[in-house]
Amino acid sequence: MKNEPTCAPADGPAERRWMRRRLAATCCAVLLALPGIAGAASSSPQRGGTLPFAVDAEPPNYDCHANFSFVLMHVVAPHYSTLLKFDTANYPQVAGDLADSWNVSPDRRTYTFKLHPNVLFHDGSKLTSADVKASYDRIVHPPEGVLSVRQADYAAITSIETPDPLTVVFHLQWPDAAMLANFASPWNCIYSAAKLAEDPTFPKTHILGTGPFVFVEHVKGDHWSGKRWDKYFQQGKPYLDGYRTEFISETAAVKAMESGRIMAQFRSFTPSERDEMVEMAGNRLEVREGPWTSYVALAFNTTQPPFNDARVRRALSLAIDRWGGTEALANTTFLKYVGGLMRPGSAMATPEAELVTMPGFSRDIAASRAEAKRLLAEAGVTNLEVTLTNRKDVPVPYGPAGEFVLAQWREIGVRGTHELLSTKEWQAALEKGKFAAAIDLAADYFDDPTINLARYVSRDLSPSNHAGSTDRFLDALYIGQAISTDTRERMKIVRDFERHAVTEASTVPLLWWNRLVVSSAKFKGWNISPSQYIGQDLSDVWIEQ
């Protein structure tokens, strides 16, 4: 018999029934998340079955190097391999994927990787070091017509060599503290060099990888599916026959989880949604919860007035009561923590005592709003009206965050309207600067300043800087922290970077997220991590029959 917690509400008088249901939901949510209880009946992996899971919206295109949203990662990750990857069971440890072994030189400026032999693309062609080089050349030096969102993360790389078909060597112009983690980025899908030579934009519209699952179809507006790659280089994997992604709203996903139509949604549910599902489905579900390397940000288009004036940007950031926002939004969204540019609780995070001295983070909202009004008057801006561009088809947390911001601006006399776009339109607006102010996403796969601060580096160096700003002081600090080998010195540089960035307020954090994943209790082999991007190739997961 399975060792599962009993969480079903007992019968009782009507006046006590509601209370018991709420206690039952809490019981399940807590017990199922405890080590040794959740998954206590798991055994050796079993083969077979198709995993159905939900994604809120469809990807705008298929290119890993150009995208930054989970709607792309969750559907394409099973088709691709990366050089390294994170071991989610022992996060943040890094493990090999295509790399069988690797070596870092004593000066940390040369990284040598030995690749697994006999790795095949899904068209039967053999992967070699040339494919790795071509993929990273595309990331570091994207050709015309190709967008490499995380290009700034790899500024240290000066050259890539392929001395033989199974060896690739990266040379750096300076030692980068985050480089090994960057080689494990889930976004660095390895593409076919031959296909890229024919058409550098091939990955935008086609799927051809070496991952555990072969692409089957994308039926727009309905689903995405993949099947097991029988020639996958990791012997015995994957365990699943395939997977099927249903493109449905978060609300529909809650009902689908309750009915058993889907087995997972890998991004997050809200606390209230979790309680509803556990109340309805009880111990058929497993709940996992943890910190999240993601926050909602507010980006201002610095190339257009009035947001080319830092005083105006800072005023609109000062108007926002972030501390009050956590209380208002924590239960109906997963917006939970106030923090700066580094995840609250992480090693490089700014302590609260220092954070509250930075513009926009004070607990004295009355004083902050008085300063906001003063700055607007000083800048000569009156009767300000702002269109806030936002994401429509992934409503949580974007919609509530946008409404919250607009309400906060009204407190200083700024009127705003909400422009709601599809993910594809929203992403295009951010990339092309077709907005005045926008709700933006800051989501990463690892807590490291080189990765986390790249979106604040000048736009000509970092395409992920949606504000379009140029700030050579931040650029210098960014390189300075990356090459620093002294932890205390690096932390000081990061603090200076953070204070300058939130004062200039081209892009500012709103609230950090808390991840809450609900899945079928029969779904095994998957571990929650602080990022919704890693651990999604599905090579290790299986379904208990």
Name these PLM-found stretches:
Residues 67, 282, 340, 347-348, ...:
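Acidic-aromatic pocket-rim loops
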